Regions:
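Non-catalytic accessory regions flanking glycosidase/transglycosidase catalytic cores in CAZymes
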Residues: 2-14, 33-42
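Active-site acidic/histidine proton-transfer and metal-coordination neighborhood
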Residues: 3, 77, 81, 94-186
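Conserved beta-strand positions in the central sheet of alpha/beta enzyme cores
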Residues: 48, 84-86, 143
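Short, acidic/polar
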Residues: 26-39, 121-132
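Short, flexible/disordered intra-domain loops and linkers
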Residues: 23-28, 57-63, 161
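Catalytic domains of carbohydrate-active enzymes, especially glycoside hydrolases
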Residues: 32-53, 137-138
């Protein structure tokens, strides 16, 4: 059985922009302060902050309130606020169907590639760090993906056997409930 979270957002923050789609090697897209000033110049009030190591040290944010205060200050200096952290790439790696292993390996750190079990554990740990970091940043929402465990069932051929989708969702619940619990506990 899947538990429902009882925490709710009190208000919507924004307009906000998802920074991951604009990150690059050249200014103003190559660091957090520059990205924030760029977003503010376009009229945005908030940012969805990707947990990319070029923008935030997720493990440090999970452990250090001072570091989170520094990140918040960088964002506030541009006149913005963080609406949520995002762990889209890590979330995808929580539940990868074996048929997609090779395609999704590039989302993981190089030292974890070709090791699905280590990659999955890293992704779970990242999400749990994100839960703690979100709490330290005072965030009530989080953006992620749930993985590619069931993608092959969207347009199946040949027909899938009875119970396959239910089994897939049970496995997603087994993997995600500890992560969601970490958000509730943070």
């Amino acid at each position: 059985m899947i538990k429902k979270s009882t925490k709710r957002m009190e208000k919507i923050k924004g307009p906000a922009i998802f920074l991951a789609q604009f990150m690059g090697e050249e200014a103003p897209f190559n660091d957090l302060p520059s990205l924030c000033h760029w977003a503010a110049s376009l009229g945005y009030k908030g940012i969805q902050l990707p947990t990319d190591p070029r923008l935030i040290n997720l493990a440090k944010a999970a452990k250090s309130q001072r570091y989170c205060d520094e990140i918040t200050a960088i964002v506030a200096d541009a006149g913005l606020e963080i609406t949520e952290l995002s762990t889209h790439l890590q979330g995808q790696l929580v539940a990868v169907h074996p048929a997609y292993d090779q395609m999704f390996d590039s989302f993981a750190p190089k030292e974890l590639r070709n090791n699905p079990a280590a990659r999955t554990q890293w992704a779970i740990d990242q999400l749990k760090c994100a839960a703690k970091a979100s709490a330290r940043l005072g965030l009530k929402a989080h953006a992620t993906f749930s993985g590619a465990l069931l993608w092959h069932t969207f347009y199946p051929w040949p027909q899938r056997p009875p119970g396959l989708v239910e089994l897939g969702f049970e496995e997603l619940a087994n993997r995600w409930l500890p992560i969601l619990d970490a958000f509730d506990e943070a």
